[in-house]
Design a protein with these regions (language model features):
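Generic detector of N-terminal low-structure segments
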Residues: 8, 18-21
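C-terminal helical subdomain
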Residues: 45-49, 294-335, 345-352, 360
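Rossmann-fold NAD(P)H-dependent dehydrogenase/reductase core
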Residues: 40-282, 359-365
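C-terminal amphipathic/interface module of NAD(P)-dependent oxidoreductases
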Residues: 35-40, 340-365
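N-terminal polybasic/positive-inside topogenic patches
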Residues: 9-13, 27
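Extreme N-terminal basic, low-complexity initiation segments
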Residues: 1-9
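Short glycine/proline- and charge-enriched loop/turn segments
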Residues: 229-238, 285-292, 331-334
Length: 365
């Protein structure tokens, strides 16, 4: 195929939409002197970054399908994970169920961590014919209950000596404030503290492995709390808003992923956001948003693709600690407000905040 010649792109200096202009400008001015393959890759990158800057098309099924087409993505089923053990939390519906289905065809040995035994049994029965590895193993746990997480980790440690991938997917957006058995706001408990404890306990089994955390594009709206002013990850009851609390927890997940990568170089850590996917969680928690965006929402399978890909791809095509969407590294901030909050002091306070929760629990055992 003969590629068209590209003339240098002249970008207006006015800041009509700075992010969009920067994304479009990318490296097009250099295409004149590059080879065909470089031209293809550069144009693909430009399109992807433009979609990302525009948000709505980038997060929707439009962005997914355009990127899949221009990237000529390898099917998840083409990866060979025979002999690899993958732990997935929250596998009974939505993204988690689709990740389990996609990875079943790779030959991976799946460990499904779920709170509902009956729902997990249904998933296991349905994906068993797809499995080319061992039949999936069920481990019961409520990720917002630290005692339940500890028991699940003990069960995993008793059955396995090594884990290749741990996928933190479990969680939900709660519209009313709920408290975990350990007295922690439930969104923070299930999305942040529970996964932090599980990672800590399973880390000896994850040497040479990878931890994948499923965040959300909603985290772009949230800065880190101002811990010096007495704020924590938990919103007080008189100011509680489910979507805002969810975004705070999702921001914490991404920041902690970067910090885990610095703390534990023997294990790879990545986080990602799936875009806007039509899952039971979206249908139940934010029905108004779904009604408006229904025509452009991704399927749960499309939203799950990058999760499964990050579990399967070797070597990791990026640094440990990186943040992904649609098989590409993405920025962790889109606004000066959230970037300004991301300081060394705030990060140290975040780590201490979560460590204190976990230490308080482990000392009480």
């Amino acid at each position: 195929m003969k590629m068209p010649r590209f003339t240098p792109l002249v970008v207006p200096t006015q800041r009509i939409n700075e992010n969009y202009i920067v994304a479009l400008r990318c490296d097009l001015t250099y295409l004149w002197h590059t080879d065909q393959m470089t031209q293809i890759k550069t144009v693909s990158s430009c399109i992807s970054r433009a979609l990302d800057a525009a948000v709505v098309p980038g997060f929707s099924k439009i962005g997914y399908r355009v990127r899949q087409w221009i990237g000529n993505w390898q099917a998840i089923s083409d990866f060979d994970l025979r002999g690899k053990t993958v732990v997935i939390t929250g596998p009974t519906s939505g993204l988690g169920e689709q990740v389990a289905r996609q990875l079943a065809a790779t030959g991976a040995n799946l460990v499904l961590v779920a709170r509902n035994k009956e729902k997990c049994a249904r998933v296991i029965d349905e994906i068993a014919p797809l499995c080319t590895g061992n039949k999936p193993v069920f481990i019961q746990a409520e990720m917002g209950d630290l005692e339940s997480v500890r028991s699940a980790c003990t069960a995993i440690q008793q059955q396995f000596t090594h884990l290749d991938v741990l996928i933190h997917n479990a969680g939900a957006l709660l519209n009313t404030r709920q408290i975990s058995p350990q007295g922690i706001e439930q969104t923070v408990a299930s999305h942040v503290v529970g996964p932090f404890l599980m990672t800590t306990l399973l880390l000896p089994l994850l040497v040479g492995g990878r931890v994948v955390t499923v965040s959300s594009g909603g985290m772009y709206t949230s800065p880190l709390p101002i811990f010096d002013n007495g704020e924590t990850l938990e919103m007080p009851a008189n100011k509680y808003a489910g979507s805002k609390q969810y975004a705070i927890a999702k921001r914490a997940q991404v920041t902690l992923t970067e910090m885990w990568a610095a703390h534990e170089p023997q294990t790879e850590f990545v986080s990602m956001h799936p875009g806007w996917a039509d899952t039971p969680g979206v249908q139940e928690s934010i029905p108004g948003f779904r009604r408006i965006t229904a025509p452009i929402l991704r399927s749960a399978s499309e939203g799950a693709d990058t999760i499964a890909w990050l579990a399967a791809v070797q070597p990791l095509p990026g640094e440990s600690g990186s943040f992904w969407s649609d098989r590409e590294i993405r920025p962790t901030h889109k606004s000066p407000r959230t970037k300004k909050s991301d300081t060394k002091t705030a990060r140290a306070a975040l780590w201490k905040n979560i460590s204190d929760y976990v230490d308080s629990f482990t000392q009480s055992i």
